[in-house]
């Protein structure tokens, strides 16, 4: 029987308009199969990425790590499943490609991997910065988003203090002072004082960690291109409609006031809506889940959730990060 999604908003020219940019301008969700030898992976888009969130589509073992690579740290990767130091390896970034080395981390022979690649720039709502802490003295870190960030991801890189290299997540709609951790399933915790003075040009961090090196990733919603929000679930199989005002290519999701998984869904994992959904766990060692739980349709204006599970749509609040498969008419990404 053909599966026909229902209950979502109909596309009209008034809602979406005519796309002004090619879909590949700034975000790519894609898969590749490891060869065991160094090679370039085609992202399916033309732009040169600056950031890669990757997941081998198997349970994590000694050769199968989830992590983040970026253009500020060429030749290094960061594990998103654990609070561990950065390690040598990673990828190189080229126009429309990522270059993987011969190591098993991203290139295990025969293993399929998923990547979410982003381009840095004001018009894409994404920036990165490295900074040194200064003991208990707050440090002002500049960014170039052209407006206040909606979300910040940051962590320790190196230094004598040996600070816990957790992946801290700040969002403007979390309770004041509260943070999540990307490398944890825990609910948001009180991190008052760590992130303050979030503004259009800078953010103040107080890491209380000597002169250690940290890295921050800044995200800002761009109309028609990306969205970073917190919304309530309805605990109903006829779930909420996440109105992004664009057709999503990738969505990252986490309950904020409940212990629960970070989950990522994308059009690379499921090119079409169907009665099951492939879901990966960026911060857990589990293999991808394929089934009717976490079911959600990617539609013209957003995501229609069709599940009442606590991970995606219980009676809790959820951080939702979405990037467009097709940017809408009002995107700045031109």
Predicted regions and their residues:
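Surface-exposed molecular-recognition determinants
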Residues: 2-334
């Amino acid at each position: 029987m053909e599966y026909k999604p229902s209950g979502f908003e109909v596309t009209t020219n008034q809602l979406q308009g005519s796309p002004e940019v090619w879909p590949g301008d700034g975000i790519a969700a894609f898969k590749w199969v490891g060869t065991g030898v160094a090679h370039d992976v085609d992202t399916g888009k033309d732009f040169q990425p600056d950031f890669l969130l990757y997941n081998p589509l198997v349970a994590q073992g000694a050769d199968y790590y989830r992590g983040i690579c970026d253009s500020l740290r060429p030749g290094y990767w960061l594990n998103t499943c654990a609070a561990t130091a950065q390690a040598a390896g990673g990828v190189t970034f080229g126009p429309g490609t990522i270059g993987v080395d011969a190591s098993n981390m991203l290139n295990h022979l025969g293993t399929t991997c998923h990547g979410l690649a982003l381009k840095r720039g004001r018009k894409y709502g994404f920036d990165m910065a490295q900074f040194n802490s200064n003991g208990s003295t707050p440090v002002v870190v500049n960014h170039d988003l052209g407006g206040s960030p909606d979300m910040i991801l940051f962590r320790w890189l190196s230094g004598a203090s040996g600070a816990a290299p957790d992946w801290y997540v700040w969002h403007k709609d979390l309770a004041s002072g509260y943070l999540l951790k990307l490398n944890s399933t825990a609910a948001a915790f009180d991190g008052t004082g760590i992130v303050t003075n979030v503004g259009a040009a800078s953010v103040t961090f107080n890491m209380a960690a000597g002169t250690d090196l940290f890295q921050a990733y800044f995200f800002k919603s761009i109309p028609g291109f990306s969205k970073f929000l917190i919304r309530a679930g309805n605990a109903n199989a006829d779930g909420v409609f996440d109105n992004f005002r664009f057709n999503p290519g990738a969505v990252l999701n986490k309950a904020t006031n409940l212990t629960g998984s970070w989950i990522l869904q994308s059009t690379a994992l499921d090119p079409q809506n169907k009665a099951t959904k492939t879901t990966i766990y960026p911060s857990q060692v589990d293999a991808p889940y394929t089934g009717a739980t976490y079911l959600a349709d990617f539609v013209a204006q957003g995501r229609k959730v069709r599940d009442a599970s606590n991970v995606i749509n219980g009676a809790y609040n959820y951080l939702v990060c979405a990037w467009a498969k097709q940017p809408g008419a009002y995107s700045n990404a031109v």
